[in-house]
A protein has these predicted regions:
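A surface-exposed regulatory interaction patch that couples sensing to output
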Residues: 234-259
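Aromatic (Trp/Tyr) and acidic
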Residues: 3-102, 131-154, 194-213, 250-294, ...
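C-terminal beta-rich recognition modules with glycine/proline-rich loops and embedded aromatic residues
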Residues: 286, 345-348, 353-433, 501-655
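C-terminal beta-strand-rich structural cap/linker in extracellular carbohydrate-active enzymes
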Residues: 443-446, 488-510
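Tight coil/turn sites that cap or link beta-strands
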Residues: 440, 494, 521-523
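Extended ligand-binding groove/face enriched in aromatic
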Residues: 70-78, 86, 95-237, 241
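Solvent-exposed beta-strand/loop surfaces of large extracellular or lumenal domains
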Residues: 455-490, 508-511
Length: 655
């Protein structure tokens, strides 16, 4: 019996009937129940053997962090927020356990043991002392801790006890004039903890659900104070009547709301609040958050347009890797809480499109080891493992659902029995998924039907095998039963195979300035503008134009500078698109997102147009004059993640 079950048996029912969290639409599975397969396994292995898996070996903001020494004794940090090690830990915990990598587990255990051993007598966790204490950096570290407790029961009791002790102190701090939350030392910026407080509340709700105790009423009080005291409430920001469709980054009164990473995290804030406040208001504001953000500040690749700060929908605005991973996690969380199929579609797109574009061979971000600022270096490892963990969900009392489609294997308990499912697929590069299912008891399987899918050209075939009986195959119509997009398939005890074919074709999405983005399924395609690169020693974020950092222990650490080699100023005629795909059983290159590695491509006719550069560097807003300045030509479109220089929002012309 686990520690959590012992606790639950002794104190169950102590909380007030009114103090009850709103239920998940789909409950998340414990970390480690879901493993990557196929191309997704290759990508995660590249992360483990590349930069994320070696930061603990050389990166001073990780292995010399102030978190690993006695509080107040100092260490290496890129800011006094002390967030580097917590960011890294939040991503490395699930990576280590999903891959069952003993080397990475050793790193995680070493850090967890040191940090928890330094917990102070009054409950504080972290390197700060006195008035330097503030809540923010604990948020990602605690998300790492709860994942470790789920993945490894040897850590469960120690972690739960440490968190419960911390939140007793946290409650006192909030009652003491919002100490460390809205009231910090003059040189500590409180706003990061305020605007991102929903992620801290997730840890509190995890404790309430899994480890009820005599302190539950205090935890509820803490959640309510966090919401009441913060000066930055995402539900009020996402009021359609006042939402800023175009923003001025110099307006300091709204800076926390327009920071790209904050927005990525803030998407789920109203969903987190709904879980303990209930009511239609927070559900609607959750929907507003997604609709307004992606309508006015969203990228076709699934992330948020913000060169750190939002501005408008100009095509030249980029997006941090941090923003992409936080956005995908928020959308996956929102799908589990509220069940809107659109959230799951968007979570898939953010990972399979935007996440890849910022990586080269899993070794470094596109522009370097720590381009301009180190936060993405330490924060990006959470992207893939959280996508894998959240790809399967528990449905009701006897169901298991495939929420985020892709090549994964799951081993878990459903309806009191053991269930093992292997999903073999090249999705999203192909449109078919094959499931091999073994179950010790009957259960209900749920498969998500994406909103963009053509139901008329989709199919399901189920083959059931039972001891001593011949296999029987039945076909089913594909249909989503409700807004969740889930289709229910009863599965009998024994062995079952299932073939799921998604109706897919080229999809044209209209964007600002009479431009379009081209998809096949949820996979965005970009104009192939060629690719050339040069490398150098990695540069310090504080000296990006200097000679680079020598003496690092890994020769693989390089900054890579990329450029295009073909014309980019192209307008296309979408009516001429032709798709060239691969077979369901075709082998996939590893790594899959190298330039031109995927065999999938499209062709489209177009021509060059006059199109100016902004600041002489990047394409400006698309011109209204689409007069061809060249002859008609057939161009090649390739998966966005494999195009290291991107032209995916393209003007149209009728040829």
């Amino acid at each position: 019996m686990s520690f959590g079950h012992k606790i639950a048996q002794t104190v169950l029912g102590l909380a007030s009937a009114a103090d009850k969290l709103q239920p998940w639409t789909f409950r998340p599975l414990p970390v480690g129940d879901v493993k990557p397969a196929g191309w997704l396994l290759g990508e995660m292995q590249a992360m483990a053997t590349g930069l994320p898996g070696h930061e603990h070996d050389f990166y001073i903001f990780v292995n010399q962090s102030s978190w690993l020494s006695t509080p107040g004794s100092g260490g290496s940090e890129y800011s006094n927020l002390n967030e580097a090690l917590p960011y890294w830990f939040n991503g490395l915990v699930p990576t280590a356990y999903i891959l069952d990598d003993d080397r990475l587990k050793g790193q995680v255990h070493d850090v967890a043991d040191k940090v928890l051993s330094f917990q102070t007598d009054d409950g504080w966790i972290g390197p700060e002392t006195g008035d330097k204490r503030n809540f923010w950096a604990r948020t990602p570290f605690f998300l790492g801790l709860i994942q470790l407790a789920e993945a490894d029961n040897q850590w469960e009791q120690r972690i739960v006890a440490a968190l419960q002790k911390f939140f007793q102190l946290g409650n006192k701090m909030l009652h003491n004039g919002s100490q460390g939350f809205t009231r910090c030392a003059s040189d500590v910026d409180c706003t990061w903890g305020e605007v991102r407080i929903a992620d801290m509340i997730i840890t509190i709700q995890w404790l309430l659900e899994k480890y009820p105790s005599n302190n539950d009423s205090q935890l509820w009080d803490t959640m309510n104070m966090f919401y009441d005291q913060t000066n930055y409430k995402w539900d009020t920001w996402y009021d359609p009547a006042t939402y800023r469709k175009v923003v001025d980054p110099s307006d300091k009164t709204i800076t926390p709301y327009i920071h790209g990473v904050n927005v990525g995290q803030g998407l789920k804030a109203s969903s987190v609040m709904w879980r303990f406040k209930g009511g239609d208001y927070f559900r609607q504001r959750s929907k507003n958050a997604v609709d307004l953000t992606f309508t006015y500040h969203g990228s076709a690749s699934g992330s948020i347009l913000a060169d750190e700060w939002q501005r408008d929908d100009s095509q030249y605005i980029g997006s941090e890797l941090c923003t992409a991973v936080e956005t995908s996690y928020s959308l996956a969380y929102m799908y589990q809480v509220l069940g809107d199929n659109n959230y799951a579609d968007r979570a898939e797109t953010a990972v399979t499109c935007r996440h890849q574009t910022c990586l080269l061979r899993g070794v470094a971000t596109t522009y370097g080891m720590e381009p301009l600022y180190p936060c993405c270096t330490v924060n990006h490892p959470q992207g893939y493992p959280k996508f894998v963990t959240n790809s399967w969900v528990s449905v009701g009392s006897k169901g298991l659902g495939h929420a985020l489609l892709g090549p994964t294997n799951v081993n878990t308990k459903v309806n009191g029995g053991d269930v093992s499912i292997e999903c073999t697929t090249n999705y999203p590069f192909t449109n078919s998924l094959s499931y091999n299912i073994r179950a010790s008891k009957d259960f209900d399987l749920y498969l998500r039907v994406p909103e963009w899918m053509n139901l008329h050209t989709s199919s399901l075939a189920v083959t059931r095998s039972a001891a001593g009986k011949a296999s029987a195959t039945a076909t089913m119509a594909v249909e989503a039963s409700d807004d969740t997009g889930m289709q229910k398939i009863p599965i009998s005890q024994g062995t079952t195979t299932l073939s799921y074919s998604l109706g897919v074709g080229p999809r044209v999405e209209k964007l600002a300035d009479n431009t379009v983005a081209i998809f096949w399924g949820n996979l965005l395609y970009a104009l192939d503008v060629g690719y050339t690169s040069t490398t150098s020693l990695p540069h310090s974020y504080g000296d990006p134009r200097g000679p680079g950092i020598s003496g690092l222990p890994f020769k693989e650490l390089r900054d890579e500078f990329v450029n295009s080699t073909k014309e980019w100023n192209v307008a296309i005629d979408p009516s001429t698109i032709k798709y060239n795909g691969i077979g369901a059983s075709d082998s996939m290159p590893n790594p899959i997102f190298e330039h031109n590695a995927p065999a999938n491509f499209m062709t489209v006719d177009g021509c060059q147009i006059k199109w100016d550069l902004k600041m002489g560097v990047t394409p400006d807003r698309v011109p209204t004059d689409r007069t061809c300045t060249s002859e008609r030509k057939t161009y090649r479109l390739i998966p966005y993640g494999a195009a290291k220089v991107h032209m995916s929002q393209m003007p149209t012309v009728q040829l």
